[in-house]
Regions:
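Central regulatory/effector-binding core of bacterial HTH transcription factors
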Residues: 1-46, 117-118
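A ligand-binding cleft/hinge motif common to bilobed small-molecule-binding domains
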Residues: 42-49, 121-149
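Alpha-to-beta junction loops
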Residues: 32-41, 62, 110, 128-135
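Secondary-structure junction motif
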Residues: 72-73, 86-108, 172-176, 180
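Flexible hinge/capping segments at coil-to-helix
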Residues: 51-88
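Ligand-binding cleft/hinge of the Venus flytrap
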Residues: 4-12, 35, 81, 98-111
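A late-sequence structural motif
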Residues: 150-186
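Short beta-strand->loop
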Residues: 53-63, 139, 146-161
Length: 186
């Protein structure tokens, strides 16, 4: 998102931008209540209504990562059931990621019981780096993290996406319309 904000701000320095950093579920609630024109959210997001117009910004996969100094995973991919033998670090229950992971594990007949639940992927990474557990993070966040390695699963988690969304029934401001155009060039 930062490169788009940087470019928009450079092209339109007169526009004041309000940014709120909350969960994807919270973003969807702001959009539905008319408190935000545009949101960037993980998708799928159960709180988005059928009146929400979506534009994909990024496709990604959630991955599990561990510090090999603390967790020797070996070369063989783990089953999801075997993964549950380790302390799992993940985002808090009121997040689309948590909903998604619980659904994926439940589809395999498994109950996901995380050791740690936080509101920050960065903090999950920090805790995984010091060996407190195996963190579930978006794959794009693993870059430049030499102390962490992906945990290979027999069945990789399905891909998801980050989307920019707006309510189709509401008229967007000229600034919001202009900002959306940056994403049509992806």
């Amino acid at each position: 998102l930062i490169p788009y904000l940087r470019r928009f701000h450079k092209d339109h320095p007169e526009v004041r931008i309000k940014i709120i950093n909350i969960t994807s579920i919270g973003c969807a609630e702001l959009l539905e209540n008319g408190q935000a024109e545009l949101i960037v959210t993980n998708y799928p997001n159960s709180r988005l209504s059928s009146h929400t117009k979506l534009q994909t910004v990024l496709e990604f996969r959630d991955i599990f990562v561990a510090n090999p100094d603390y967790f020797t995973m070996g070369k063989s991919p783990l089953s999801m059931e075997n993964l549950l033998d380790y302390p799992i670090l993940m985002l808090a229950p009121k997040s689309t990621t948590s909903e998604y992971l619980h659904q994926v594990f439940a589809a395999q007949g498994l109950k996901l019981l995380p050791e740690v639940e936080l509101n920050s992927n960065d903090l999950l990474i920090d805790l995984a780096e010091i060996g407190l557990g195996i963190a579930c993070i978006p794959d794009y966040m693993l870059r430049n993290r030499p102390g962490l390695e992906p945990v290979h699963l027999k069945t990789p988690l399905p891909a998801r996406s980050a989307v920019i969304a707006h309510h189709e029934a509401l008229q967007l401001s000229q600034a919001a319309q202009c900002f959306l155009k940056y994403f049509s060039q992806i």
